[in-house]
Amino acid sequence: GQLLGAAPLYLKFNSYGEFVFDWGWAEAYRRHGQPYYPKLVSAIPYTPSTSPRLLLVADQPHPQDTAQALVDFALEESHRHRLSSIHWLFPIPAELAPLQARGFLPRIGCQFHWRNRGYRDFQDFLDAFTAKRRKNINRERRLVREAGLELRMQSGAALSESQWRTVHQLYRSTFDRLGGAATLTLPFFQEIAVTLGERLQVVLAFAEGREVAAAICLRSDSTLYGRHWGTSKNWL
């Protein structure tokens, strides 16, 4: 038959990489002698970004029916495998209807987004702040200059192999310092540098010609998503 839709799902035995914290639920299950894991999760790993989770082929006659069928099949599979729960993380608003129609409960979270309100330049952006905040921002930028740091943004594909090794070491240093596991490997970043092209952007900070800090970002047509960062020391 013809493919009309798909819903990638993960069978998970922990809650790492979701950015939705349900450890309390897992503990409640444990205290009552019930298994919380494995659970079924619809998400982009390590990416708390709202985007389609029910992938529907365009121009089909009944897309709502296809979406509902995907949700229903996931429920059937969860019952068949005796899973504790299904979690659809960060779906788009249009996907709430087929989920709530089957009893899914919405869980509301909070994120902080910066939006460009048509600023002409950086000074125009600064002018939107109070005098005190402008002073603080200018002070932070002055400290960067005084530290002798040079910032550059490059596509992931433009980085050399040695630069990617340095970027990955900086990425790992954040987890070493703050705790947690640096799950994403160097080959993973090198692979998406090729497959994503200009969509993968890396901000590099140089001191005396050497990379000392980095931020790994993903870019859509309208948005820059900061994902991972690391630094060799506290420069400011």
Regions found by a protein language model. Name each.
Residues 49-63, 229-236:
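A short, internal acetyl-CoA/4′-phosphopantetheine-binding micro-motif in the GNAT/acyltransferase core
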Residues 31-48, 61, 66:
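Internal alpha-solenoid helical repeat scaffolds
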Residues 1-36, 72-236:
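A conserved beta-strand-loop-helix scaffold within acyl/acetyltransferase catalytic domains
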Residues 8, 43, 53-55, 63-77:
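Long, well-ordered early-domain segments
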Residues 42, 58, 62, 66, ...:
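Conserved aromatic-histidine-acidic binding/catalytic patches
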